[in-house]
Regions:
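Conserved alpha/beta enzyme-core scaffold
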Residues: 1-444
Length: 444
């Protein structure tokens, strides 16, 4: 290896100019030492856009109360984040700490296009693993999903935060050499990857899990998301055998299923023998399990979330959550009203791909209601609140599950579909929903 420039975090941050667009990380692959150093320049810079997504890392950038009396982009409040997926870090930065943000609605299968047309980084900070014998670093537990495109589109310089705590993941398009032509500097660090503890499972999630798991056969290939419901479902799948994994997310329950032997990856029919994923968020135990594990295979979003690749897996079971469902069968999973919660993500990619799969199913799971200010409110309604975007259209929705059952909407005409959806609602709301459906002319 030649021409490797080792730097400090401050030297990486010094490369940023006013008006720059700076990529800083995704989920558990987040270059937070460089980001903290960039934060220290808040009184020098203006109009710096931070490109990030699904952040779970505590850092001063996201935990500072940004001044309301200084317009976003000015010195003292220079940073604006631009994202295709709001995680806990981005939500907290905006809602609790007054940080300005921009959001673009994009399917994860199109992240190469997002990076090329919208992201357009001038400078990029990437957390990567320590190098292998040949001097190449892995993009780590989550960087696999998009770092290939980050490097391709970065205009001035890529700075690597080579971390002993970032797992080395096998896969495709997931390595970068320390002497790569775009690498302007390498920072050596030694800390754990950011952890995301499993959600505490409640009774409703347990009920829904048992209903959903009944729809999953032995030999199924799985896609699961984050959250307490997905966690419950993942652990309940210990009842199944010869499972496979082809999922945008690799999660804690998937590790457990692999360790227990429930996941063998021998029945998928596509990329057998490997758990295929794009990003991950979990505990240090999970990252250690993934490190140099030949049964773990990472690939970018445009590959894993390509519905054509998803469909190549036999008995592909896609399980996603939702925030609300209306009586048409439309699904809202990323925003309610004008308040952005997360993102379109890969839900529609997997909803379509799973249904194209031989023996596959798409399942949307949600609790029927929630409590606010001591009052129960329904997640199933005649129509969404004004401003609510549709994540998955009614023409693509197949199974929907709540704690009251699971129905296949795909095979139902409109009036039968409406009645089936009402049967999934909390009993307190069924009469009201039935009357509203009659008044709207949806049922007789």
């Amino acid at each position: 290896m030649t021409d490797i420039r080792y730097i400090t975090a401050a030297e990486a941050a010094a490369s940023v100019r006013s008006g720059d667009r700076v990529y800083i990380g995704t989920s558990s692959s987040f270059a937070y030492e460089m980001v903290d150093a960039l934060y220290d320049r808040k009184d020098e810079l203006e109009n710096v856009t931070l490109l990030c997504s699904m952040s779970i890392t505590p850092c001063r950038m996201f935990d500072t109360d940004w001044p309301a009396d200084i317009p976003a982009g000015r010195k003292g409040n220079p940073f604006i984040f631009d994202t295709f997926f709001l995680g806990a870090g981005e939500r907290s930065a905006h809602r609790k700490h007054n940080m300005a943000f921009e959001y673009t609605s994009f399917h994860l299968s199109q992240i190469d296009l997002w990076m090329r047309e919208i992201g357009r980084p001038d400078i990029s900070f990437l957390q990567v693993s320590r190098p292998d014998e040949s001097g190449r670093c892995s993009f780590g537990s989550s960087g696999i999903c998009d770092h290939k495109y980050v490097v391709e589109e970065t205009k001035r310089g890529v700075y690597l935060e080579s971390n002993t705590g970032s797992p080395y993941i096998y896969g495709q398009d997931n390595l970068i050499s320390l002497d790569h032509e775009k690498v302007a500097g390498v920072l050596l660090t030694d800390h754990n990857a950011p952890e995301l503890m499993p959600d505490k499972i409640d009774d409703i999630s347990r009920k829904i899990s048992k209903i959903v798991v009944a729809e999953v056969p032995d030999g199924a290939t799985l896609q699961l998301g984050l959250g307490k419901m997905s966690t419950a479902i993942g652990y309940d799948l210990e009842q199944r055998n010869d499972l496979g994994i082809f999922s945008e997310l690799f999660s804690q329950p998937m590790m457990v299923l692999m360790k227990n032997g429930n996941v063998t990856n021998q029945c998928k029919g596509f990329m057998d023998g490997m758990s295929v994923f794009s990003f991950s968020a979990g505990t240090q135990e999970m990252y250690d399990f993934m490190d140099h594990n030949p049964q773990i295979y990472g690939a970018p979003f445009p590959f894993v979330n390509d519905a054509r690749n998803i469909a190549k897996n036999k008995k592909m079971i896609s399980i996603n959550s939702a925030m609300a469902v209306n009586l048409y069968g439309e699904v809202a999973a990323d925003a309610i009203g004008y308040s952005q919660q997360s993102a379109v993500g890969g839900q529609l990619d997997f909803v379509k791909g799973a249904q194209w799969s031989e023996g596959g199913k798409s399942i949307i799971a949600l609790s029927s209601s929630f409590m606010r200010n001591g009052r129960r409110r329904s997640k199933i309604s005649l129509q969404f609140a004004p401003g609510t975007p549709v994540t998955t259209p009614r023409s693509e929705v197949q199974y929907v599950a709540t704690e009251y059952g699971c129905v296949n909407l795909k095979v139902l005409n409109m009036s039968d579909r409406v009645r089936a959806i009402i049967s999934l609602a909390h009993p307190d709301f069924r009469d009201q929903l039935t009357q509203e459906a009659k008044d709207a002319g949806l049922i007789r």
